[in-house]
A protein has these predicted regions:
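Amphipathic regulatory helices of Ca2+-sensor modules
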Residues: 349-362, 385-394
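Conserved short submotifs of the Hanks-type protein kinase catalytic core
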Residues: 92-105
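Activation-segment/catalytic-loop signature of the eukaryotic protein kinase fold
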Residues: 87
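Conserved N-lobe beta3->alphaC-helix segment of eukaryotic protein kinase catalytic domains
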Residues: 47, 52-76
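Activation segment signature within eukaryotic-like protein kinase domains
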Residues: 124-125
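Conserved N-lobe ATP-binding subsite of Hanks-type protein kinase domains
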Residues: 35
Length: 394
């Protein structure tokens, strides 16, 4: 199945046998419904990644979601976004060919290099926002921006994982919930949002880059998301070394009223990116790395625990559903978190709050970080993740 728009897109289905143009080298990662392999593209002699998705037991709707992701990503050609080359379709599999990204995830790379400054944060965020500005100009919203979906390839940032992306229309709200608890915008949880949900996620990422800890926490998944809805955060002592302009940008990006939240272009024009920033002292940098190491480790541990329990599910039907979820495909016709018949809830601050900036709470009110890093939990069940080619699968 392909629609007319896809047929005229330069990224088209390759009707030739895969083996004609590609020589499979090795398997990089496996999942319940697919695997990623490294392959040599014979005409160009360059290495690429191929995601092989077994579609024999997939519903038609799930296949359509795969093609929707291919369509969205094929519209994008930007140095900070993973590149898709082509795809193959057989009776058994869909083969999606992308550039091979050997670099690691953003946080892992920062931890490995043992040094990260505000100057580095500005350079990183500038590339992320540049990619998001490009996406939004193409009327595509990512909807699951987070450090795991930001790779470092050499000196270049690459955004991946467009499984939850979609086309949007100007001045038209979206209502289906997608995202990861730490980075999800409050209006998404209230099922009324626009493309600026990506800006909120960037604001959370920038906050973490500058101190190593998230602005919102909770002892459970539910508490975490309730805190996101309240949008109360603080800078406190851990931001004493951070410039006022950086904090001002974060405050703008975490504006509760998304209508008043800046666009990616607005953010890129912020004075923080043009102001000379004092280099972060080494002892402060080391503290950030230690915070980040703890946060990153617990996030990955929680994901591993989640996958373990998925594999222990008792019933055959539940295992079938879990396998789909592990492959990143949401079963059924609706892959959204919003329940059937659920009425969209309106954010209490939308249209009624003065000022619009996220309310900052007293630093002493903050709970200890890392107690409930649940990003692999309930929200992950709503994700449709197919093109995050990192040599491993969800």
């Amino acid at each position: 199945y392909m629609d007319k728009e896809m047929l005229f897109n330069p990224i088209n289905e390759n009707d030739s046998p895969l083996e004609k143009d590609y020589q499979i080298q090795e398997t990089l990662g496996k999942g319940a419904y697919g695997k990623v392999v490294k392959a040599l593209h014979l005409p160009s002699r360059e290495y690429r990644a191929i995601k092989i998705i077994d579609t024999r037991h997939m519903h038609k709707e799930d296949k359509l979601k795969i093609f929707q992701e291919i369509k969205n990503l094929s519209k994008l050609d930007h140095p900070n976004i993973i590149k898709i080359y082509e795809y193959f379709n057989s009776n058994r599999n869909i083969f999606i060919v992308t550039e091979l990204l050997a670099g690691g995830e953003l946080f892992d790379k920062i931890i490995d290099q043992q040094k990260f400054s505000e100057v580095d944060a500005a350079r990183t965020m500038k590339e992320v926002l540049s990619a998001i500005q490009y996406c939004h100009e193409k009327k595509i919203v990512h909807r699951d921006l987070k450090p795991e979906n930001i790779l470092v390839e050499g000196e270049t940032i690459k955004i991946i994982d467009f499984g939850t992306s979609r086309k949007f229309e100007a001045n038209k709200m979206m209502s289906n919930s997608h995202g990861t608890p730490y980075y999800i915008a409050p209006e998404v949880l209230f099922n009324r949002y626009n493309e600026k949900c990506d800006i909120w996620s960037c604001g959370v990422i920038l906050y973490i880059l500058l101190c190593g800890l998230p602005p919102f926490n909770g002892r459970s998944d539910t508490e975490l998301m309730e805190n996101v809805k309240m949008a109360q955060f603080s800078f406190g002592k851990k931001f004493n070394h951070v410039s006022k302009t950086a904090k001002a940008l974060i405050t703008r990006m975490l504006t509760v009223d998304f209508e008043k939240r800046p666009t990616a272009r607005d953010c890129l024009g912020h004075e923080w990116f043009s102001t000379k920033i004092t280099d972060t002292p080494r002892e402060i940098s080391q503290g950030i790395i230690e915070n980040l190491k703890s946060f990153n480790y617990k996030s990955k541990l929680q994901e591993a625990i989640y996958k373990f329990f998925v594999n222990q599910i008792a019933t055959k039907e539940e295992k079938k559903v879990a396998a789909l979820l592990q492959a990143g495909v949401t079963p059924g016709t609706d892959g959204d978190l919003q329940g059937a018949g659920q009425e969209p809830r309106r954010h209490p601050d939308q249209g009624g709050v003065e000022g619009g900036a996220a309310r900052q709470r007293d630093p002493d009110e903050r709970k200890r970080p890392g107690a409930a890093l649940q990003e692999a939990g309930r929200q992950r069940l709503g994700r449709h993740r197919l093109l995050g080619v990192r040599g491993r699968l969800p």
